[in-house]
Amino acid sequence: MNNQRKKTGRPSFNMLKRARNRVSTGSQLAKRFSKGLLSGQGPMKLVMAFIAFLRFLAIPPTAGILARWSSFKKNGAIKVLRGFKKEISSMLNIMNRRKRSVTMLLMLLPTALAFHLTTRGGEPTLIVSKQERGKSLLFKTSAGVNMCTLIAMDLGELCEDTMTYKCPRITERQPDDVDCWCNATDTWVTYGTCSQTGEHRRDKRSVALAPHVGLGLETRTETWMSSEGAWKQIQKVETWALRHPGFTVIGLFLAHAIGTSITQKGIIFILLMLVTPSMAMRCVGIGNRDFVEGLSGATWVDVVLEHGSCVTTMAKNKPTLDIELLKTEVTNPAVLRKLCIEAKISNTTTDSRCPTQGEATLVEEQDANFVCRRTFVDRGWGNGCGLFGKGSFLTCAKFKCVTKLEGKIVQYENLKYSVIVTVHTGDQHQVGNETTEHGTIATITPQAPTSEIQLTDYGALTLDCSPRTGLDFNRVVLLTMKKKSWLVHKQWFLDLPLPWTSGASTSQETWNRQDLLVTFKTAHAKKQEVVVLGSQEGAMHTALTGATEIQTSGTTTIFAGHLKCRLKMDKLTLKGMSYVMCTGSFKLEKEVAETQHGTVLVQVKYEGTDAPCKIPFSSQDEKGVTQNGRLITANPIVIDKEKPVNIEAEPPFGESYIVVGSGEKALKLSWFKKGSSIGKMFEATARGARRMAILGDTAWDFGSIGGVFTSVGKLIHQIFGTAYGILFSGVSWTMKIGIGILLTWLGLNSRSTSLSMTCIAVGMVTLYLGVMVQADSGCVINWKGKELKCG
């Protein structure tokens, strides 16, 4: 027997209300349905249709709908929306097939014609603005009302940078690889691509420019982006500080008084020290300095002047002269070629054809100001073609250069040289000033190579110069970019991958290779974007590393060069030759300062009463014997005993005494000069070899009185150079040196006199031609850096 209790069944009516449950009415179902939709409940397709309904009516969705929208999976939602799109397209086609009345068209056209309608080659053209994106553009044609749809993503503000292409006619197929289509006839569309601020689209990529490193010119001028200038300034600061300790202490005191912290004091002191080297003596403050000493009775001296160096000439009974090449100017150089480093494009137009319909054509292709590119693209039903295949495609864009640089040819007849000549007078103001105030400037041109300048109290000096720069201008181009200029290799300049035009001045410039600054994007069925690269100025600055930088002043360019001059000193006289020797005592005004040329500067003040007079000056050893020192300042004299006198001299190597005055009242200064005579000889030889590498054949003319010994090297090169080059053309430099040493050794050890002399002569000539520098190649020994450089 089953004693299990049965479950109580649900009553068929409500015991409290005493009434049966009823079926919901229609209004209750509608209320429940709408409430569920507003909260985002229901099937996906139904909810998305309701969301579209709200969007059409511009009704903001509820929080529940937004939450449900966020929960939809991407693939499923896209599939539903594509179904909506297909249904709407079908509805549009049905509506387009209906016959509309004239009244209906007149009502629709004003709302659709928010764009500008024109024609291109007899075909309709729409000029649309940014607001027309995604809208239906309606206009009347001979085939009926044409409705075009434009969904271009690059649609921007109207400007000169426009995009023009043809919208194909697509009726029953889904558009493929197009962002504009029409339903009645093919239509051209034009729109701007600028941003709201009017800026054009640019590509950030830079052109790959080959660096100029390794193609630089052998001059003493600093190269672009090198550290030479900084090191030279530091060396000048060090030399000036050691020479002027009093001013250095004053600068330190000023920095301590002005600055509030250690960092500020240090910065102020460094800035003061960087400025002070501008107060230096001409030639004394220049690192590259050459001394030329003429023989007794000399009436002329040959010198070679170059930028960044100074020449000091000395001759018996003649004043000591400091000569420096201030600048080399070139006026109105001819323009060889112009390069474009920044451009802009406009009026981009594209034409495309279906397969088997021939080549695409554009009128712009015949215009030299347009850059064009042809290609082939895939065409088919989805972009207005009845056949599938490759169709012809052509895009053109108008090219305009915004920033350009010029390459100019320098001609010898357009050169002008400025040479400054300063006399060593011992004036204290002359020592403390590097300006041209105390010197006389001569101007040399190829048309007037001779100049006579008057030196106050010292007569006249005639400069007979040969305007030979030492640079082969057939291989050099003067590159000018904005306010900067460089001397560059001509072939490097011509090989730069940048748009170029000829140097001839014309009203309309025609650029070649415009495509080097233009990027054609991926070609679509009816459209291709074209963008221009950004400014290449930064890339050019990087590529110019190692080039010789040139200063420009207006239309005149100042650059590195060389000048060979003959100084005719027959009209020069030495001031104070009739004065007697000073008998009084001298007082040292400043500590003896050593220059970077091995000379010393002595500043003394005369305490006697017999001025004007000549200053006795000599260099002696500890026993009082006069040594072979050299007095750079010729015939130092005292004019006014109240003014100090500066004397430059070259003491001998080792320990010596600088004696100023005579007798027991003489001022005796102990001095020690580092180095040796043999080392100086080798260093001078190496310096001459470097000058030869820089100046070429001009360097061999450096000397005085046209001496034979200075031309021996040139003579050997001219006689034996050609034969030597033919015999040893395939032999390495080390092998040439080895052969020369071997022949010399055989000559020294040979018992036969004739054979010995022959071997020694041939060995020495071979060794000389192998070591010394010719006009086109050679080797230089750097004794200070302990290295050998060949080139």
From Swiss-Prot:
One of its GO terms (molecular function) is lipid binding. It holds the Pfam family Flavi_E_stem. Glycans are attached at residues 183, 347, 433. Keywords: Capsid protein, Clathrin-mediated endocytosis of virus by host, Cleavage on pair of basic residues, Disulfide bond, Fusion of virus membrane with host endosomal membrane, Fusion of virus membrane with host membrane, Glycoprotein, Host cytoplasm, Host endoplasmic reticulum, Host membrane, Host nucleus, Host-virus interaction, Inhibition of host innate immune response by virus, Membrane, Secreted, Suppressor of RNA silencing, Transmembrane, Transmembrane helix, Viral attachment to host cell, Viral envelope protein, Viral immunoevasion, Viral nucleoprotein, Viral penetration into host cytoplasm, Virion, Virus endocytosis by host, Virus entry into host cell, Zinc. It comes from the Viruses. GO terms for cellular component: extracellular region; host cell endoplasmic reticulum membrane; host cell nucleus; host cell perinuclear region of cytoplasm; membrane; viral envelope; viral nucleocapsid; virion membrane. The chain crosses the membrane at residues 102-119, 243-260, 262-280, 726-746, 753-775. GO terms for biological process: clathrin-dependent endocytosis of virus by host cell; fusion of virus membrane with host endosome membrane; symbiont-mediated suppression of host innate immune response; virion attachment to host cell. Residues 1-101, 261, 747-752 are cytoplasmic. The record marks 100-101, 114-115, 205-206, 280-281, 775-776 as: Cleavage. InterPro entries: Env_glycoprot_M_flavivir, Env_glycoprot_M_sf_flavivir, Flav_gly_cen_dom_subdom1, Flavi_capsidC, Flavi_capsidC_sf, Flavi_E_Ig-like, Flavi_E_Stem/Anchor_dom, Flavi_E_Stem/Anchor_dom_sf. The transmembrane domains of the small envelope protein M and envelope protein E contain an endoplasmic reticulum retention signal. This is Genome polyprotein. It comes from Dengue virus type 1 (strain Jamaica/CV1636/1977) (DENV-1). The lineage of its organism: Viruses, Riboviria, Orthornavirae, Kitrinoviricota, Flasuviricetes.
